[in-house]
Amino acid sequence: MDRISAYAAYGLAPKKTSKRSTMKIAKHFSKKNAKKTKEAMAAKKEARKAAAKAALREVRKLERKAAADKAAKIAADKAADKAAAKAAAKAAKKAAKREKNIAKKQPEKSAAGVTENVQKQLENGQENNGTLINLSNGKQHQKPKAAKMSSSNGSFSGIDSDFLNSSDFGSTEDSFMSGSGDSFDYSNNSDFDFDSDGDSNDFDDSDAAASSCASCEYFDMDSNMVVGQESDTNGNSYMHNGTTQSEDQFTEEYTLSSIFNSTSSSGANPIKVEPRKAAKRNEPFDLNNNKNKPTAAKQPKMSLKQEQAQVGKQRADPAPSCPLPPRPSKTMIKSCPLPPKAPAAKPVPNKCRLSSRESLTKTGAKSCRLSSAPADKMANKMAAPSRKSSSKNKNNDNNNIDTNNKKDANNKKDANNNKDINNKKDANNNKDTNNNKDNNNKNKLSSNVSQLVTGNEKQRGPVHLENSIEEGKRMLNWLLNPITSETFFEQYWERNACQVKRKQPNYFTQLISFQMIDEMLIENQLEFTTNIDVTTYKKGVRQTLNPVGRAMSPAIWGYYGDGCSIRILNPSTYLPKLRQLCSTMQEFFHCLVGANVYLTPPNSQGFAPHYDDIEAFVIQVEGRKRWRLYAPPHQSDVLARTSSGNYKQEELGQPLFDAVLEAGDILYFPRGTVHQAVTEPKQHSLHITLSVYQQQAYANLLEVLMPSVLERAIKHHLSLRRGLPLHIWQHVGLAKGGQQSEQRDQLMNSTKQLVQRYLVPTEAQIDAAVDQLAKRFQHEALPPYIKPEESMRTTKVRLLRRQHPAPGGRRQQLRVYYYVDNALEYCKNEPNYMEIQPTEAPAVEALMTTYPAYLKVGKLPLRSADRRIEVATALWERGLLMTEKPFK
């Protein structure tokens, strides 16, 4: 047992391997690994060989296929050549047979000078394969296999002259065949060179369809003529090879008998007639040879009414909501096709990142519950009457002016002159009724354009006595009617949104319409991106699809038909009444009043949810549009100074306002209000957005004011020019913000004291900063809309408008900025100004102070009468002054 246990213990005990055994084991495994490596290399080699063989088989297969295709192509070409040769032989045989028949029918009308041998050959139908025939006059003639000919000496003047007299086309690409890309040119009316390549009667359907005659409506001869038979100018009938003369006069084919008849009257001249060749496909359209010309049986001529009827069947039904009149069928452009119905908009999520109440409570603004003021609940005294015709409105307007002028007892002559001018407008003619012809011609553009009718003309006095600020206020009252401007600024301005609903669809139609847009695009050079934007908003993605170049009317309506929204920038440049609205309102707001027009097809949305940096007035002119307004996402977005990017729907909360604007309604919302709008499935939308008060906040004033205050303080106070302490970097800075020390507190207090002591602006500095904002307005503003009554009054004087001029300049000279001569485009030119001496400034200030009252030139606060007249003349020449009485 001990011996067994000893062996067991020896077997279980860990054995220490020797160096020799270790080397044996390593050698064994190395041989085994080498064997496996060789096997793997052999397998890879076999795989490469198999892949190479497979690739070689594929290459050979492709080569065999290419060779087969090449052989098939060669066989097809041979078959095509054989078919073409057969067709040529068949055509030549038909031509010979036709000549034989003609010779039998008209033996008496054969050409003079032809020998009896030639006539006998024609009667017997013998073919003369290109051999020369001796004529009786000693000349030779070659009989053709086909009827096409080449004339080099004008021997067909009797036929060709009639052809040219009855045809009217040019030699440019705008001729009747310009649709095929070819042109026709000739230099001699009596000499035509017809190509030797004839046409073939063997056309398949594809050829007939591809080579439809573009000249059918230009060349309509005798519709009762029998197909296959035609007559020349001498009354001789001859056969046609299947085409009709009514389709194209170049399809005439002259047979030998007709040639002889024509030559008998013009003299016996040698004529060379080339044989006919088979037609080839894919050749350019040859007007002389009628290549690619379909036969009459395959391409019958249709009248113009039939063509229009056929085109009308292919066109889609016009959109029921499209206000544009249908275009003629020849334009090949659908007026305003409706896009296919899009899926309904996704519902607004119930949750948002920041609730509207929190946002508005933090800023101190009132709740953003939108107020609605329906017109049927309030008196509508200021609403414009419904217009049945433009002449009635002009009559009413003129009568109002006449009545008001008659009430002014001190200006009876003035009223009579105005009455004459207005009667001239009333009849829509330009006959002069008094001696104001020169003044009226000078202001022809202003007087001929019909004015905006707001319905409140009776409430004002004579135009030349009105304050331009009050005129702007009246225009705002017309927009917000029945809400007054006082109520609007007290309850809604920069606080809440406001909707005015009125059941008057035509309330704003005088501002813009589809027809006005179409005329504007046709008559003016509007550019994409500069004047027109084409946008879409689908599946949460907003795209701008602006091409390059001019925005043509067909392109715009094409985009509209595809479901794109059209945004027209600065439309007031081209629409007089909209320009009058904007230029009048800018007098009240003392800032640029811009306008954009948005045209949206049914069931579409052109822009993603966003907010703007302007006070927005949305004027719904036509159609319907659903508007949804949301609270500003953050506190810093309330009354935002810059526009936002595009928001996703899930980033917005529930809308504060969700309603539909109808034609005649108006919606106001402050800057910073997130909004989006979408049209209904069967309703388009045309609306105007008036933008007001952009960059008109206290922040803008301080941005102009504080740099000048700091500059002046640095110049006058030594404390601001002293150096900073050496240890400031050790105690102040972002890295030291959490550490408190005596040095840090001392530096903070001293900096605050410097600001409070030296950076407080003076009144003069505030005045100068406001003048800078006024200067910016003079540059941006639209030129004033001059009424006919104002254009006559240009030695009491007053400023033409309250909001100009704006003083500015240097010490030695002052600049008076004005916007009378501004371009209609936004900031197109540099600001307009005139320079005056500092001693002349009191005269300008006096005119600004007494506005809108008139002031005698002699009362201007200047020392000498010459200086008064000089200043008044300079202002009047620039259009800044208006006289109390009109010039005669």
UniProtKB/Swiss-Prot annotation:
One of its GO terms (molecular function) is 2-oxoglutarate-dependent dioxygenase activity. One of its GO terms (cellular component) is nucleolus. Fe cation binds at H610, D612, H675. Signal peptide: none annotated. It catalyses: N(6),N(6)-dimethyl-L-lysyl(36)-[histone H3] + 2 2-oxoglutarate + 2 O2 = L-lysyl(36)-[histone H3] + 2 formaldehyde + 2 succinate + 2 CO2. InterPro entries: JmjC_dom, NO66-like, RIOX1/NO66-like_C_WH. Residues 98-108, 273-284, 404-429 have a biased composition (Basic and acidic residues). Its cofactor is Fe(2+). Residues 392-403, 430-444 have a biased composition (Low complexity). Residues 116-139 have a biased composition (Polar residues). Pfam families: JmjC_2, RIOX1_C_WH. Oxygenase that can act as both a histone lysine demethylase and a ribosomal histidine hydroxylase. Specifically demethylates 'Lys-4' (H3K4me) and 'Lys-36' (H3K36me) of histone H3, thereby playing a central role in histone code. This is Bifunctional lysine-specific demethylase and histidyl-hydroxylase NO66.
